[in-house]
Amino acid sequence: MEKRPYSVAWLSESSQRKPLCTNVDLLGYKSGNPDLPPNREYNVSLPSRVILPTPDYREKENYCGRNVHNGERSPPVRDQLHFHPAPQELTTSRRTSIEVSAESSTDQRVIGMTDTNKKTISVCDEDAASRARTKFTAEQLEELEKSFKENRYIGSSEKRRLSKVLKLSENQIKTWFQNRRMKFKRQTQDARVEAFFSGLYLPYYGYPDLPTPGYSVQSEFPVLAPQTMAASSIPFGPLHSTVMSPGLHPAIPSANLGSYPCSSMLVRPILNEPTRQRYSPY
């Protein structure tokens, strides 16, 4: 093998040159093995580096062109490795899976609907049983009202007596007393609000814990008389002219004051305010 000077042209020719022997023991060539066949050309660019033969893609291109020309197409490598079913098989399998899932979902829906219907029916039955209202007669209501006036919180002995007399269960009597207490509370609150806006607190009549005074309201409270109210109609008069002096106000017994739920809302505490002139802007 003759030695040539290394140049760019020689390197390009050597890279484009087709190797004659691809299966060559390059290690033996480097070590100077004399068994190598003579007159062979090797694709060697540099002594320290060996350029391996580049694969020839022309045969592959010709093979693909023949397949395309004949109407065939070579399958890719991943298709060769993994088997993929045909589209028709996919569609049929998908249809069967969809049908099976639809049937199972319909069955589950039917079962769920039946369960919900059973639950709703049971809940309705329980509500109907719990919401059963007791219709009291006039005699029963009269006896219950009489017992409520005596004591708003019924005891066990009174409950047993009423259940025997009125032929009612103790739970029915207990429920009636609870509802009656709530009604009494609402009536008392409404009366307080109405009395607050009217200027005089009037207690709730008809029960022993709120005794009513035995005297007339107009005679004992002359503050509400028309003569005194006419004097208070002056818009910018002094305050002491509209309020009566404490000596003219009638003395109310202390026992009656204690019977009121809120005695501070009476007209009398207004007299404790200091007397001063009202401011007149004009």
UniProtKB/Swiss-Prot annotation:
A biological process term (GO) from this entry: negative regulation of DNA-templated transcription
Main location: nucleus
Annotation: DNA-binding region: 129-188
Gene3D superfamilies reported for this sequence: Homeodomain-like (1.10.10.60)
Function text: Transcriptional repressor. Acts in a ventral signaling pathway downstream of bmp4 to antagonize the Spemann organizer and ventrally pattern the embryonic mesoderm. Represses transcription of the dorsal genes gsc and otx2.
Location(s) in or outside the cell: Nucleus
Keyword Nucleus among record annotations: yes
GO CC annotation, single: nucleus
Lineage: Eukaryota, Metazoa, Chordata, Craniata, Vertebrata
Species per Swiss-Prot/TrEMBL record: Xenopus tropicalis (Western clawed frog)
Protein name: Homeobox protein vex1
Gene Ontology molecular function: DNA binding; DNA-binding transcription factor activity, RNA polymerase II-specific
Alphabetical keyword list: Developmental protein, DNA-binding, Homeobox, Nucleus, Transcription, Transcription regulation
Top-level taxon of the source organism: Eukaryota
